Amino acid sequence: MKIIISGPPGSGKSSVAKILSSKLSIKYVSAGLIFRDLAKRMNIDIVKLNKLAEDDFEIDKKIDLEMFKLIKSQDNVIIESHIGGWLFHNLSDLSIYLRAPLDVRAKRIASRDHISEDEAIIQIIKRERSHRERFLRYYGIDILDLSVFDLVINTSYLLPEDVADIILGVISRKNLHSALSH
């Protein structure tokens, strides 16, 4: 079974993907972690790397190609990626978009990254603007168009476990458990 989870920063992508990975006993891969890792190796923050990626398509292309190879080569995988749902929906059994209002996401990011909510809002706005411009320019993808997703969930008032349970219910209803290759 191949599952793609997309959504804006702070929507709960990583938390939900990790829970699903554990409950389904399948591999989890995060484009966000690869991107953060690259920023760390370059000794810059993620906002700065996003800015660099606006002028250098090779940065996004490298990460997206790695994700493409993974989803093609794995029978069972959960891919967590901002743009994965648009790029790889035809290769997945289930594509999911998680969303939440800016203030909710800012609280989550502030808590995770130990920054103020105001700083989190600034970072989120910068990252989202960068993502939207890059993905439109490089791929012709409007990240406001959610029509490619099988499932869209507002995570505002849900715990990650609740979101995972909703997704597991959809998997069960779609009979995707039989798609698991062991």
UniProtKB/Swiss-Prot annotation:
It catalyses: CMP + ATP = CDP + ADP; dCMP + ATP = dCDP + ADP. One of its GO terms (biological process) is pyrimidine nucleotide metabolic process. Keywords: ATP-binding, Cytoplasm, Kinase, Nucleotide-binding, Transferase. GO terms for molecular function: ATP binding; CMP kinase activity; dCMP kinase activity. It is found in: Cytoplasm. It holds the Pfam family Cytidylate_kin2. InterPro entries: Cyt_kin_arch, Cytidylate_kinase_dom, P-loop_NTPase. Gene3D superfamilies: P-loop containing nucleotide triphosphate hydrolases. ATP binds at G7, P8, P9, G10, S11, G12, K13, S14, S15. It comes from the Archaea. Its EC number is 2.7.4.25. GO terms for cellular component: cytoplasm. It is an enzyme of class 2 (transferase). Belongs to the cytidylate kinase family. Type 2 subfamily. NCBIfam families: cyt_kin_arch. This is Cytidylate kinase. It comes from Sulfolobus acidocaldarius (strain ATCC 33909 / DSM 639 / JCM 8929 / NBRC 15157 / NCIMB 11770).
